[in-house]
């Protein structure tokens, strides 16, 4: 208990003058803490006061007034640094809620109202209270049933003032005397569990740079090549090495968090008195560049508040296994590159991940070259807008089940599956791509891919970039593009380049009023088989906006137009060859109908 103030609330009758006075007992409780916890950073405080400790009213003036009512405002002020705020309650000091005439032989009193009422509707010789801007007065609560009048959720910004008002209505029949009661305002700090909160991921990473050896530079970032392990230390506070440094968020953490480097064991140790370490909302880059890490203990990290997890495990190239069963991702919105270049991980289980708030999954699994088992059955993609490079370079994964993917909000699928050269079949029948604008290199370098099921909702009507979309997908023999709408596409550069498995390409539904770049669109390079013989269309390409058309058909020596036309050196074909071959108008296309 930090303080107590006590005064009386009285009603006097003297020479036909009634004086009503108010007093309050204000009780304030602060948060206690264990003084033996020498490492604790944060000490909660709480103070409170009232600006009028003895309210008085001239009863005669009230009775002689037009409506026989009065309203007495007063303020109570609270100041606390408690991070969960405070709760204030109001009650009478006893079970008696009336203003009692202590000298009356008949037990005269001013009763509390029994229901919420406006001031003018108060019964004669009653009183009540109201809080703030409320228009109604409430009954005076008894000691056993205090009423909560304020509850906050955070520390005050300096002194926080709250207004209460006492209202009453008096009548001519009120017995002369001295009317008394006492009210109690209790201000209690809300329960608060002190926490160890980590600094931002980027700051943590830089702190590690400052204590480890064998750093190599990577675009201004240190690759921690001398670190093989990250583990929690069970040392007592007094046994922490002198060279340990602080990595807590000093604005919100109640405990210090220490890290140090053990060169003998090539280990980064972290230490905190708290059982769990709360990861920062911004944990981007936290473990970026631990290129030689073999194992990492994250079981005591609480990630429930993390919003940005981008590049969290980026370039952990030597990590063999990763247990994410304790990870809480409920609030994460950005998972860009979170596992990118963790290219020694063979298995990754995200079955416990809640990704319902994630909007960015670009490069999420980028270049996980050894990954051959991926569980993403529970991944929620409903809010995701960016999937660019999501599975880029996941070269050993032989199957990918995307049946649970909701892609209705995705706008960027560029390079999404590029380099997945062990995938043979890709089922996108559940994909809704109506909002996608970028599909550049989406299926490029998928050298084992033999079948893509696009489905009816694979909508390309808003796509503007199809650059390299099927580049070097050398095993595709059949390609059903019958649902493709290409009216907004500006670039088809290298779209079908290096597709050595195709003999026939049907793009009969293609329309190109926006096309600006068709460079190397059907090109084949040395070392790739040239098998393409026919390209079916329904109409000439619209080349009115075309600015780049070099090497469109380079080395396509087997390709013939519908009327048999071809060039001995296909690289010399200009944009006029992007048309149906017919007498008087040579082209490399064949009319389908």
Question: What name fits each language-model region?
Answer:
Residues 1, 19, 28-30, 57, ...:
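Intrinsically disordered, low-complexity segments enriched in small/polar residues
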Residues 39-194:
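Signature of Gram-negative chaperone-usher
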Residues 192-593:
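Negatively charged
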Residues 5-10, 151-154, 427, 475, ...:
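Intrinsic structural disorder/low-complexity segments
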Residues 11, 76-78, 88-90, 129-131, ...:
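Generic structural hydrophobic/aromatic packing signal, biased to beta-strands
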Residues 1-41:
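Sec-dependent, cleavable N-terminal signal peptides
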């Amino acid at each position: 208990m930090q303080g107590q103030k006590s005064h009386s609330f009285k009603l006097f009758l003297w020479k036909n003058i009634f004086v009503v006075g108010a007093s309050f007992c204000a009780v304030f409780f602060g948060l206690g803490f264990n003084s033996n916890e020498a490492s604790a950073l944060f000490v909660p405080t709480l103070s409170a006061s009232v600006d009028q400790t003895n309210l008085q009213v001239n009863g005669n003036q009230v009775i002689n007034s037009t409506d026989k009512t009065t309203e007495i405002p007063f303020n109570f002020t609270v100041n606390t640094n408690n991070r969960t705020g405070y709760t204030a309650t109001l009650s009478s000091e006893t079970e008696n809620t009336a203003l009692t005439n202590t000298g009356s032989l008949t037990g005269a009193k001013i009763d509390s109202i029994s229901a919420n009422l406006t001031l003018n509707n108060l019964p004669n010789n009653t009183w009540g209270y109201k809080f703030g801007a409320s228009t109604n007065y409430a009954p005076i609560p008894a000691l056993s049933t205090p009423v909560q009048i304020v509850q906050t959720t955070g520390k005050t910004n300096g002194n926080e003032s709250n207004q209460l008002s006492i209202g009453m209505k008096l009548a001519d029949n009120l017995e002369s005397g001295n009317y008394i009661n006492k009210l109690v305002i209790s201000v209690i700090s809300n329960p608060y569990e002190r926490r160890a909160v980590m600094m931002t991921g980027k700051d943590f990473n830089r702190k590690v740079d400052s204590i480890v050896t064998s750093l190599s530079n990577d675009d201004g970032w240190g690759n921690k090549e001398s670190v093989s392990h990250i583990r929690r230390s069970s040392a007592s506070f007094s046994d922490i090495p002198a060279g340990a440094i602080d990595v807590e968020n000093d604005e919100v953490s109640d405990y210090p968090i220490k890290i140090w480097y053990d060169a003998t064991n090539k280990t980064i140790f972290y230490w905190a008195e708290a059982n769990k370490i709360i990861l920062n909302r911004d944990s981007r880059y936290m473990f970026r560049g631990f290129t030689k890490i073999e194992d990492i203990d994250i079981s005591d990290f609480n990630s429930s508040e993390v919003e940005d997890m981008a590049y969290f495990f980026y370039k952990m190239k030597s990590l063999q296994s990763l247990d994410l069963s304790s990870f809480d991702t409920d609030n994460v919105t950005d998972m860009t590159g979170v596992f990118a270049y963790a290219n020694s991980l063979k298995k990754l289980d995200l079955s416990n991940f809640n990704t319902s708030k994630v909007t960015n999954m670009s490069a999420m699994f980028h270049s996980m070259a050894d990954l051959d088992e991926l569980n993403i059955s529970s991944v929620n993609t409903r809010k995701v807008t960016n999937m660019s490079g999501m599975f880029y370079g996941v070269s050993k994964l032989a199957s990918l089940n995307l049946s649970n993917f909701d892609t209705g909000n995705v706008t960027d699928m560029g390079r999404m599956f590029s380099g997945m050269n062990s995938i043979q079949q890709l089922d996108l029948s559940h994909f809704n791509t109506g909002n996608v604008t970028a599909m550049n290199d989406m299926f490029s370098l998928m050298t084992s891919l033999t079948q893509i099921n696009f489905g009816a909702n694979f909508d390309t009507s808003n796509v503007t970039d199809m650059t390299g979309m099927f580049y070097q997908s050398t095993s595709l023999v059949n390609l059903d593009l019958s649902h493709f709408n290409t009216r907004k596409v500006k670039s088809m550069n290298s779209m079908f380049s290096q597709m050595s498995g195709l003999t026939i390409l049907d793009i009969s539904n293609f329309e190109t009023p926006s096309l600006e770049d068709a460079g190397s669109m059907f090109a084949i390079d040395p070392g790739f088989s040239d098998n393409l013989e026919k390209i079916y269309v329904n109409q000439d390409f619209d080349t009115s906006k075309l600015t780049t058309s070099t090497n469109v058909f380079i080395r396509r020596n087997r390709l013939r137009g519908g009327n048999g036309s071809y060039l001995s050196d296909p690289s010399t074909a200009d944009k006029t060859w992007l048309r149906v071959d017919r007498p008087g108008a040579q082209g490399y296309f064949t009319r389908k109908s």
